[in-house]
Each structure stands twice: as structure tokens, then as C-alpha cells.
């Protein structure tokens, strides 16, 4: 009896949902058994013989005597002592670190490291006998030492770990009065078993296993690497030294001051003293990589490090770095503040990239680009992530948010400016418009859920801090900055950014500090307006009536949700700069939240009678717009006659708004679907990309409906056919056209277009025969070729290609192909591979599970595997891992049955501790309930419209 079966009777008796659940549990169990082999011996992953690329582990080597701890004793053991202020989550204000001398010695092959830190501390105002700072997992190996600024030793009475707040507490024998002190601590940590803190990973080079060790500290993992005051406003300077074997090199935030050869095996690299910085930005790496270098216009060396065999893949990132670096120095009117800037591609990296000051770390897919192996989407991803991390060298590093509740001051700004940065390098990529489909429109969906949260949100635990690294902080933050820039003007916005950076140089800041800078340069009530966007969740939908009167209400995807919950200090009313256009006239009419009757847009009197009032021109505002039904129908006719009456961002916005409004019950699906008729004439990437996303929700909901889904496929297949036939299964050098081609051919395949699927299968067959594929078609061919014609032989061939591929972007495409097979046995084998770290890196586990969940055969299998292996995942990644926290919401987005909802609630009851996934769980539940209601409310409306569309006289 499996885990689920043990509790199924109890939950059936609760009568939570529908009576038939209990009746189908046995049948479902049989189905799950087919999918996962429950009750049967699961098929092994059967990894091939080790070729030395990843798993071979050489013998342990000796450590130099310089920092080797005496013996193996552990000091400062954990105690449950709650008789002090160390029970508080936040560090006390009266203790300030001033400088860290940090010395580290990693044993690469033994996967351990030792270290010593000497912290200069300033004690302000208060007298105390206790000091505490952060430390997690890493062990103290000698009793800490405390000295006054004059060198006098202060006896330590005791030290202990307080695990609930991840502190090590030191108690002195005498009172510590205000003044300066030096705290010294020796410690030992482990490089294996994690992708956070100071950790190591391996890669293959000429059949040998190579090691690299690097750091990832944001948000609360510096404390895993070394004892520190691990809060962003505890800025200090650092002098870092690393002792390593001769055949390794070390890099850190600052340039090398000097290197010292200790003996015939060990070298000590000492780095220059840093500027004041937060703990989460402290970084170093020990490696055997090579680099590509560019020099900025001011003479700053810009290096990109990668494995020696991949050094040619760093050229594009190096070129982007130089252009974007120079662009931001000019835009912000502020020089980059360090003497050098390095970037390094880590073979196994838990996040996309990390903006460490002077040493930016990346997942390989986000830094390395090969023109012979990488697609246009990969190229754009590299450019965007490089630009994003460069923004942080100003927003985040020079000026850092005071606390994590203002994370958006880092991530929202980087997400906004990255589009400007890429645009400076690639002017033909429509990047200033692509923010619409990459950030604004996707996050409108997230922020329409009751389980959303404000941009500025209280956080009081590492899990809560981790959880706010989400679309609200990043994409909503970027979107409201775009709206602000448009309202106060680009020149004022730029001047405000420059003032903010200057006023808080090397310091910490809060959201109000940014509003203040913007108010001073623009003369507008920025704080009064923008607080309504940052201090309450959600956004409005503006209703435009036939008299051009505009009213607002909170937009919620669930029409049954209470729009007043949870409570908001602004009662879910917003101050809105409403941008509009009619004819050749464009303007902004301000909508104050106190205007309860709404506002009226005053249009010019000389407009032509057939002009259309477009509210939210360029979709620059963070809100949706709803018109009267007859206006939507008029709009559909205008778009059919000449869709270029509206620019491509407006066309994308119309489609996205219409389908969101229909899903929320504010517009009939007939009117939303009616708007899509014009797509047969659409030739631009941005509108097509958003149209596919908008209508695909319907497809996902009715995919198992044998009567309705074919009609859905026929209708939308007919719309995509013209552009798919025009673009063909061949490629050219045009970047935007490549993105368009991938989008429409993928949609054509999903609509079961015979020609598209035939081409995918033919190219797939050619590929399995050794014929190379165009880089921009590979993902499509791998997915749909495997889906429609892949057998075990083809799957094994692809798996071998994955195993031997060296470029991470190609490996990721092959993972998607492997996950697309319509064979339960092979999918089960693939799931079993997840636990084999030789075959699937830790960074890729959640990617594999998501890809399998996209497969109609694999959706249930991925969900079942996660539930059965949850304890394994928690042990491997911890509940603080943001990717684990989001996993369930990412694989359950299309769940739409009472059984799936029951399974989810059952699972959450069994494992109530969500860690960083608390908000994600709420989102998953809300989305599943919404999907169930959608089928009840709108399935028949969609069916009626699609049936009518097949009639000969349909117009």
C-alpha cells in the first residue's frame, strides 16, 4: 500500500469534494501503477559505463598546515537557550561589522574546506556581554577569540549555536562597552551536497574529472560559507585570501593583490580590500578555467571565464558585456566602482545567475553561446541575463535595499533596465517591446490571484525571504517602473535614478528613498501614486463606457473571489496615469483613486467618426481595459480589415486582455474568440507569442475532451497555417523572424497540423540518421519528432546525445525531447534517472520534472513522482530552496479535476511544512480550483462558438 492509499479512506470520509472520488481511488491507483510501476519493481535508469566525465572521484589529498584546524573537535554546539535577544530574527542595530579578514582553504577532491575569519566590530551605544552572528551547517573548530582594538584579550565564557535563527552566540566573561572589537573564529565546512554557500561541482575534460568550487550566497547563504552578520544592511569591507593547490586559480570580488607559494603544492592568493558590501554579494571561485577578455571604454578589464574546451562560447557574452557595461556607466552617470569585472559559468548552478560585485556567477545556459549550436532564443537569453546582472552592479551593489521587504529595488530595477541594456547591443530585437511578453503580461496573471502579495511585503524568516524572489518582485517591479518612466518622462526618470544612486552611494535604501528622488526631479507626487502599486497586491481593470467614462475595480481571475480580501490600506483603488490614444491624438489623463465616479477622457472634437479610443496605449500601464461588448466587436472588425491600425504591443495587449477578461467572467468568450479571427493576417512575433499563450489555456483545459479539442485544433490550426506555411521549416539570420518561426511552428504542431508534424518527424528521422539540424529548429524537432515518431531506439539515441553533449543549452533541448516521448516505460526510466547525479545535474532536476509534466502522458507521472519522492527532494534541496518551493505550482498549472485537487490537498496535509513554497502552494490550490470552475462555467460557451466557426457562413 503506497503513501496515498494509506490515507485515502480517511479523506474520502471527509466528503471534501465529490462522492465519486472514493469510488475511483482503486481505479486511479491502477492507472498510477501503470505510470510509475507502483507495486512493481521500477525500471532502473541504467546509466552507461562511467567515462570519467562526471562521477570519478580521485583520492583525497593533504591539506597545508596554514589553516588546518587542530584535531576534529567542534565548538559552539547547538543549545536551546532562549534567555536572550538572540531569539529575534533580526540582528541588533547596535552591533556593526566594519571589516572581515577571511582566509579559506578548500580541499577540492575531499570536498571540504577550512577557514578563519577575523571580524572588526563596532559596538554602538549599548553595553552587552553577548555577541551573535549567523552560521549554518559550517562548524566552529576552535573557541572563538575576542580582543579589544588595542589587542587586549577578552575571555570567552561560552559559545553556542542557536539553530532557530541560525546564530552562533558568544558570551564574554565581562561587559563589552561601546567601542571597537576583533572577533576571530576558525571553522570547517563541506563543499558537497548543496548548490548554495561555498560548494563544488565537477565537469569533464579529455576524459578526466575536473573540480570547480564557487559560491552562491543570496539571500541567506553567506552564513553557510563563513560566520558573518548576514543581513543586507550590515555592509562591511573584506580582505579575502584563498589557499589552493598550484594547478588551480582563485578569483574573488576584487583583483589579486599578490600570490604566495607556500610549498611545492599550495599557493595562497590574497585579494585587494573591497569596497563596503553586503554579505550576499561576497564571492569567490577556485577553478582551472580560461577567460575571454574585453576592455571597457574607461579601461576596466571585463573577463568571461569558462571551461577551457568551451572558451569559444564566451565570445558573445564578452561582446555584450562591453557594450552594455559602457551603456550603463553613461546612463547612470556613475562609474562602475571596482577595478575589474569577472563573469564565470558554473557547470551546476541553482539559480540563473548571481550579481556578486566584481564576480558574477552564471548557469552555463545563461552565459555561453555557440552560433553553431545555440538558437536565437538562447542568444537573447544570454544577452538579457548578462544585462540584468550588469544593472545590479549599480542597483543592488552600489545601493542595496535596506531589508528584503524591498527586494524589488534590486530585482525590479534589473528586470526593467535589462531590456534597455540589450537594446543598446541589439537594436533590431524589439527589446523595448518584448518587456510586454516577457514580464508585464505574464505577471498580470500571477497578480490576479488572491494568493498574490504586494511588491513590498514583510518577511521574517529565510523561507519568507526566499519566497519573494518571484514574478511580483521581478516582473511587476519592472512593469510599474515602465509605467512610472512613461508618466514622469524618460528624462526625469533617468535623472531620478542618477540622484538615487548618488544620494545613497555605498549605502542602503528603502522604497521611499527612490520615490523621494523621483519627486525631486519631476515635481510630481510620485510616492502618493506609486504607493498604491507597491503596498497593495493586484491591479485594476478599467471599464470604458460609450461616453468615454472610465471606472476602476480590482481585477481578479476568480469571479467568485472577494475583491476586498485580504484587506488593503488603499481599499484596492489605484492612482493611475491613464495613457490613451484616439486618431493621431495621444495623452495621459490622471485618475485619482478618490474619484469614485470615475473619470471622463476628453477627446478632441475633430476626430473622424470611425476613430477608436485606445485606452492604455502601448500597454504601458499595469492594468487591464474592458470596453462595452459592441466596442469589442467593432475592434474585431477593425483588426480583420487592417490590424496595422494598431501597433504590435497594442495588438498583443488586446488579445491578452480579452482572454483574461473572459476567464474572469467580465467578457463573453464569444467576443474574445471573435478577436482572434484577424490572426490569419498577423505576421509579427510579439502579437503571435501572446496570442498563443492566451488561447493555449483553453486548449489545456479541454485537451482531454475528445469532442471539443479537435474543434479547437481545427480552428486555431487554420489561423496559424498561413504564417507557418510562409515561414517554412528552414531558417535565416533574422533574429525576430527566428523567434516568430519557432512560435508559430510549435503552435501548428500542437494543433496537429499534418504538414508541421510531418516535417518534424522527417527532420527527426534524418537527425537520428546523423544529419545535423538547424539550431533554431532543434527544440521543435526534438520535441515533436520524439512525440510523434519516437520509439525506444530513438529515445536511447537521444539520451546518448544528451549524455555526450557539452553545451548546456543543447543538453537542455535534449532533455525536453526525452520528456516528450509518448511511452510510459521510457518516461518512467527518465524519472528514475533524476536520482542519478552522474546523468542529471542538481540544477536540472526541476527542469526535467516540468518538461515531463508538459507531456500529456507524463503530467500525472511527474505529479505522482514528486509526491512519492518528496522526502528525498527535501533532503536533497531543503525546504528553503526556491525552485523546490515553486515545483508544485509549476507542474500543476493545468490541473482541472476534483481528484487532482483532492490529491493536492491530501499531499499538503501530509507535508504541512512548505518552507519557501508556502505562497506557491496557495497559488497551486487557487489555480486548480479556478480551472475546475472554468470547465463548469465556460466549456460550453467555447464549444458553441467553435461549432459556429465551422459553419459555412461563419464570418
Curated annotation (Swiss-Prot):
Glycans are attached at residues 65, 118, 192, 312, 319, 335, 458, 547, 584, 592, 647, 674, 681, 759, 766, 823, 836. Its EC number is 3.4.11.7. Residues 55-69 have a biased composition (Low complexity). Substrate binds at residues 218, 352-356, 882. It catalyses: Release of N-terminal glutamate (and to a lesser extent aspartate) from a peptide. Residues 1-17 are cytoplasmic. InterPro entries: Aminopeptidase_N-like_N, Aminopeptidase_N-like_N_sf, ERAP1-like_C_dom, M1_APN-typ, Peptidase_M1, Peptidase_M1_aminopeptidases, Peptidase_M1_dom, Peptidase_M4/M1_CTD_sf. It is an enzyme of class 3 (hydrolase). It is a single-pass type II membrane protein. Venom protein that cleaves N-terminal acidic residues from peptides with high potency in presence of calcium. It may have several roles in venom including alteration of blood pressure by cleaving circulating angiotensin-2, general degradation of host tissue, increase of permeability to other venom components, and/or processing of other toxins in the venom. This is Aminopeptidase A. It comes from Gloydius brevicauda (Korean slamosa snake).
Amino acid at each position: 500500500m503506497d503513501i496515498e492509499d494509506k490515507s485515502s479512506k480517511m479523506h474520502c470520509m471527509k466528503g471534501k469534494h465529490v462522492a465519486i472520488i472514493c469510488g475511483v481511488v482503486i481505479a486511479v491507483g491502477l492507472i498510477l501503477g501503470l505510470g510509475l510501476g507502483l507495486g512493481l519493481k521500477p525500471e532502473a535508469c541504467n546509466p552507461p559505463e562511467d567515462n570519467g566525465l562526471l562521477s570519478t572521484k580521485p583520492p583525497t589529498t593533504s591539506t597545508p598546515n596554514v589553516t588546518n584546524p587542530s584535531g576534529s573537535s567542534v565548538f559552539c554546539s547547538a543549545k536551546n537557550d532562549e534567555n536572550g535577544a538572540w531569539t529575534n530574527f533580526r540582528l541588533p542595530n547596535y552591533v556593526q561589522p566594519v571589516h572581515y579578514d577571511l582566509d579559506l582553504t578548500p580541499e577540492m577532491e575531499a570536498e571540504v574546506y577550512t577557514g578563519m575569519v577575523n571580524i572588526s566590530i563596532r559596538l554602538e551605544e549599548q553595553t552587552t556581554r553577548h555577541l551573535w552572528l549567523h552560521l549554518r551547517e559550517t562548524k566552529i573548530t576552535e573557541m572563538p577569540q575576542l580582543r579589544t582594538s588595542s589587542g587586549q584579550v577578552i575571555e570567552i565564557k561560552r559559545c553556542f549555536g542557536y539553530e532557530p535563527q541560525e546564530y552562533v552566540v558568544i558570551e564574554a566573561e565581562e561587559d563589552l562597552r561601546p567601542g571597537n572589537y576583533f572577533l576571530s573564529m576558525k571553522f570547517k565546512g563541506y563543499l558537497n551536497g548543496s548548490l548554495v554557500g561555498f560548494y563544488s561541482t565537477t565537469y569533464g575534460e579529455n576524459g578526466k574529472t575536473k573540480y570547480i568550487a564557487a559560491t552562491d550566497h543570496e539571500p541567506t547563504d553567506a552564513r553557510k560559507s563563513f560566520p558573518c552578520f548576514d543581513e543586507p544592511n550590515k555592509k562591511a569591507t573584506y580582505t579575502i585570501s584563498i589557499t589552493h593547490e598550484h594547478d588551480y586559480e582563485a578569483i574573488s570580488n576584487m583583483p589579486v593583490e599578490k600570490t604566495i607559494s607556500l610549498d611545492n603544492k599550495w599557493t595562497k592568493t590574497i585579494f585587494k580590500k573591497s569596497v563596503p558590501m553586503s554579505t550576499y554579494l561576497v564571492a569567490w571561485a577556485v577553478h582551472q578555467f580560461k577567460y575571454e577578455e574585453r576592455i571597457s571604454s574607461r579601461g576596466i578589464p571585463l573577463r568571461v571565464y569558462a571551461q577551457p574546451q568551451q572558451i569559444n562560447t564566451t565570445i558573445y557574452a564578452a561582446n555584450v558585456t562591453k557594450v552594455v557595461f559602457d551603456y550603463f556607466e553613461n546612463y547612470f552617470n556613475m562609474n562602475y566602482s571596482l577595478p575589474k569585472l569577472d563573469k564565470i559559468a558554473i557547470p551546476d548552478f541553482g539559480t540563473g545567475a548571481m550579481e556578486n560585485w566584481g564576480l558574477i556567477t552564471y548557469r552555463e545556459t545563461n552565459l555561453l553561446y555557440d552560433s553553431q549550436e545555440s538558437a536565437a532564443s538562447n542568444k537573447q537569453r544570454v544577452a538579457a541575463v548578462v544585462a540584468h546582472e550588469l544593472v545590479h552592479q549599480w542597483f543592488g551593489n552600489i545601493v542595496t535595499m535596506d531589508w528584503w521587504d524591498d527586494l524589488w529595488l534590486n530585482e525590479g530595477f534589473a528586470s526593467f533596465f535589462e531590456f534597455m541594456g540589450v537594446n543598446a547591443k541589439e537594436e533590431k530585437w524589439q527589446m523595448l517591446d518584448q518587456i510586454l511578453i516577457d514580464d508585464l503580461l505574464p505577471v498580470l496573471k500571477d497578480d490576479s490571484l488572491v494568493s498574490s502579495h504586494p511588491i513590498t511585503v514583510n518577511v521574517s524568516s529565510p523561507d519568507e525571504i526566499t519566497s519573494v524572489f518571484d514574478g511580483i518582485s521581478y516582473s511587476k517591479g519592472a512593469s510599474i517602473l515602465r509605467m512610472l518612466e512613461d508618466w514622469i518622462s524618460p528624462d526625469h526618470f533617468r535623472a531620478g535614478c542618477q540622484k538615487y544612486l548618488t544620494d545613497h552611494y555605498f549605502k542602503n535604501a528603502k522604497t521611499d528613498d527612490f520615490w523621494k528622488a523621483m519627486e525631486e526631479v519631476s515635481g510630481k507626487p510620485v510616492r502618493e501614486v506609486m504607493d498604491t502599486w507597491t503596498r497593495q497586491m493586484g491591479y485594476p481593470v478599467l471599464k470604458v463606457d460609450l461616453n468615454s467614462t472610465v471606472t476602476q475595480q480590482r481585477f481578479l481571475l476568480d469571479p467568485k473571489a472577494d475583491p476586498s480580501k485580504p484587506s488593503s490600506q488603499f481599499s484596492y483603488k489605484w492612482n493611475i496615469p491613464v495613457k490613451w490614444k484616439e486618431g493621431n491624438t495621444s495623452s495621459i489623463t490622471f485618475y485619482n483613486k478618490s474619484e469614485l465616479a470615475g473619470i471622463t477622457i476628453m477627446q478632441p472634437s475633430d476626430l473622424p467618426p470611425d476613430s477608436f479610443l485606445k485606452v492604455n496605449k502601448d500597454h504601458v500601464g499595469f492594468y487591464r481595459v474592458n470596453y462595452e461588448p459592441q466596442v469589442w466587436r467593432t475592434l474585431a472588425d477593425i483588426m480583420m480589415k487592417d490590424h496595422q491600425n494598431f501597433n504590435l504591443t497594442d495588438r498583443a495587449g488586446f488579445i491578452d486582455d480579452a482572454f483574461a477578461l473572459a476567464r474572469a467572467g467580465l467578457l463573453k468568450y464569444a467576443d474574445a474568440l471573435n478577436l482572434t479571427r484577424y490572426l490569419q493576417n498577423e505576421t509579427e512575433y510579439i502579437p503571435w507569442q501572446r496570442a498563443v499563450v492566451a488561447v493555449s489555456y483553453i486548449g489545456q483545459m479541454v485537451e482531454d475532451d475528445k469532442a471539443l479539442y479537435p474543434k479547437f485544433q481545427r480552428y486555431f490550426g487554420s489561423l496559424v497555417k498561413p504564417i507557418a506555411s510562409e515561414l517554412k521549416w528552414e531558417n535565416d539570420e533574422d533574429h525576430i523572424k527566428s523567434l516568430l518561426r519557432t512560435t508559430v511552428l510549435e503552435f501548428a504542431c500542437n494543433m496537429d497540423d499534418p504538414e508541421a508534424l510531418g516535417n518534424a518527424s522527417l527532420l527527426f528521422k534524418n537527425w537520428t540518421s546523423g544529419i545535423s539540424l538547424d539550431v533554431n529548429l532543434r527544440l521543435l524537432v526534438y520535441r515533436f519528432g520524439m512525440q510523434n515518431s519516437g520509439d525506444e531506439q530513438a529515445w536511447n539515441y537521444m539520451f546518448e546525445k544528451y549524455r555526450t553533449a557539452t553545451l548546456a543549452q543543447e543538453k537542455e533541448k535534449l532533455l525536453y525531447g526525452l520528456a516528450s516521448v509518448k511511452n510510459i516505460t521510457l518516461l518512467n526510466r527518465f524519472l528514475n534517472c533524476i536520482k542519478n547525479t552522474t546523468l542529471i545535474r542538481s540544477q536540472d532536476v526541476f527542469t526535467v520534472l516540468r518538461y515531463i509534466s508538459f507531456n500529456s502522458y507524463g503530467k500525472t507521472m511527474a505529479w505522482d513522482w514528486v509526491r512519492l519522492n518528496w522526502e528525498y527532494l527535501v533532503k536533497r534541496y531543503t525546504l528553503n530552496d526556491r525552485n523546490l518551493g515553486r515545483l508544485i505550482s509549476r507542474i500543476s498549472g493545468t490541473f482541472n479535476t476534483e481528484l487532482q485537487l483532492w490529491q493536492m490537498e491530501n499531499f499538503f496535509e501530509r507535508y504541512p511544512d512548505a518552507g519557501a513554497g508556502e505562497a506557491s502552494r496557495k497559488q497551486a490550490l487557487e489555480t486548480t480550483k479556478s480551472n475546475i470552475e472554468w470547465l463548469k462555467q465556460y466549456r460550453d460557451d467555447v464549444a458553441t462558438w467553435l461549432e459556429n466557426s465551422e459553419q459555412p457562413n461563419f464570418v
